[in-house]
Amino acid sequence: MNRRALMGAAATAPVALATPAIAQSLPEVRWRAASSFPRVFDILYGTLEKISARVAQLTDNKFRIQTFPAGEIVGGLQVLDAVQGGNVEAGHTASYYYIGKDISFVPFTAMTFGLNTRQLTAWFRHGGGNELANELFRDYSIVAHTAGDTGAQMGGWFRNEVQSLDQLRGLKFRITGLAGQLFQRLGAAPTLIAPADIYPALERGVIDATEFVGPHDDLRANYVRVARYYYAPGFWEPGARLHFMMNQRAHAALPDQYKYAIEVACSEADAEMVSRYDASNPQALRRLVAAGAQLRFWPRPIMEAAWKANEELNADLARQNPRFAKILELSLIHI
């Protein structure tokens, strides 16, 4: 079904499913869906709740998806594995968390100096991005829809100012995706930590710095209490797209109406998430500054070194992984 027809289905589904004969013919289905994010991140975890509620609404409550925050069923970085293995039918996560399986997962969330939110939307909806993503996901017995974007992100929280490349050397930095490999080339010591575990790691000195999303989430996480230097921009995430992943067998067993309901709910989530961040981030940033955050911009020498290192990194990885090379080439057309 094309997107125009799909959105038409969204408009008519509640009316159609109100017809008793149709409603009675639909089966009762119960799924479980795991999130990579704890409840404290209300937009991130809340997006999964909104998807669940919308699916229920569009199916006359015949199809119910019970949602679980990170840690209740599986850890935040194990969502893909749980969906693939059928431990849960679905999950809401960022594909770049699974870089250890295949670097080709990374461009479907964010690339350093890559696509912003609008460009990601253009690529996924009109440039073959969805098809490329699901080619990869099929290798893991998963079907997925894009389901939210954070918008441009901040550059993270640091215990000390970073004014030169020398000050990056040995810096224990929580960072995701290929940006970790980039900062490693710049001398830092990157590590990937699940969102729920970032604050205690920063508080105990296990890490010296962290990036996450932006003001709204950073205020809720209270990172300003343990690291006051707040950097911009998050040049490794001009936009960051999330996915609603489904076990392939569980998805195949659904009636078409339920598949359409999921697609509609995810399409709405794509637009809703970034608008919520755009509405909340300005006030959250003011509150962070009032709480003691010291805003800083990356020094030009670091930005220039990062650009050079990123070009070299992408070239190296493209030579090693033909699938990554293809995905990268087809995505960058949209910049």
Task: Please annotate each region the language model reported.
Residues 2-17, 22-120, 128-333:
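N-terminal secretory/targeting leader peptides
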